[in-house]
Swiss-Prot record:
The keyword Chaperone does not apply. It comes from the Bacteria. Its EC number is 2.5.1.31. InterPro entries: UPP_synth-like (IPR001441), UPP_synth-like_CS (IPR018520), UPP_synth-like_sf (IPR036424). Disulfide bonds: none annotated. Binds 2 magnesium ions per subunit. This is Ditrans,polycis-undecaprenyl-diphosphate synthase ((2E,6E)-farnesyl-diphosphate specific). The keyword Magnesium applies. Substrate binds at residues 19-23, 31, 35, 63-65, 67, 69, 186, 192-194. The active site is at D18, N66.
Length: 239
């Protein structure tokens, strides 16, 4: 492990968890085998983020475009999601972690929506780490739904056009009052954003790992944080 500067830990880390299917294929297994092992990698990432003092960890679990996958895989993913909620929520609560599901959950089954609501209610006052799971999420969707919320408030005269600024717009995003993303990690060697947190990553540092998500461990997470700490963030300014 690389020794980290504890005064320069990113407040908000976001991860595009990519490579579950390829990992399973390498082992001649079904894709769901990769997704199942991906849950273990999530558990490790959450533990490490909490350990080093990250305030917010946002994980891209299921995009709004993922519905185009085979029906069998979608069904398996939904079952896995429910199982993970059942198994992990009490552990998250015990570790003082606040769980939030960001995305359009209305497309999920009523059973899954109820599990999400219970999990969020149980952990809402926890303060050690906020864990955002992006499910049926897309960055374009997020910006549009925020704009609609604001437009509705202006229409009802609950706010004026002059009230609209970066801060108020950010408050209406799915991530609400979370700080902007400092570090965006994508696994599996792919180098694209894939419609994830488009507003929130405006000045994020990007780190692309060749490791497939089920193999992403605390050592690889440590390397990503160390890389972040070596960079000079200018936020559009000069040296």
């Amino acid at each position: 492990m690389i020794e980290l500067d504890q005064t320069n830990i990113p407040k908000h880390v976001a991860i595009i968890m990519d490579g579950n299917g390829r990992w399973a294929k390498q082992k001649n297994k079904m894709r769901i085998f990769g997704h199942t092992n991906g849950v273990t990698a999530v558990r490790k990432a959450v533990a490490y983020a909490r350990q080093i003092g990250v305030e917010v960890l946002t994980l891209y679990a299921f995009s709004s475009e993922n519905w185009s996958r085979p029906e069998q895989e979608i069904s398996a993913l939904m079952s896995l999601f429910m199982q993970a909620l059942d198994r992990e929520v009490k552990k998250l609560h015990k570790n003082n972690i606040c769980l939030k599901i960001i995305g359009d959950v209305s497309r999920f089954s009523e059973t899954l929506q109820e599990k999400i609501k219970k999990a969020e209610n149980l952990t809402e006052k926890n303060t050690a780490l906020t864990l955002n799971i992006a499910a049926n999420y897309g960055g374009c969707w997020d910006i549009i739904q925020a704009a609609k919320q604001i437009a509705e408030k202006v229409k009802k005269e609950e706010m004026s056009v002059s009230d609209i600024n970066n801060s108020t717009f950010q408050h209406h995003l799915a991530t609400q009052n979370a700080p902007p993303v400092d570090l965006l990690i994508r696994t599996s060697g792919e180098q694209r954003i894939s419609n994830f947190l488009l507003w929130q990553i405006a000045y994020a540092e990007l780190y692309f790992s060749d490791v497939l998500w089920p193999d992403f461990n605390q050592l690889e997470f440590n390397r990503a944080i160390a890389s972040y700490q070596q960079r000079h963030r200018r936020f559009g300014g000069t040296e």
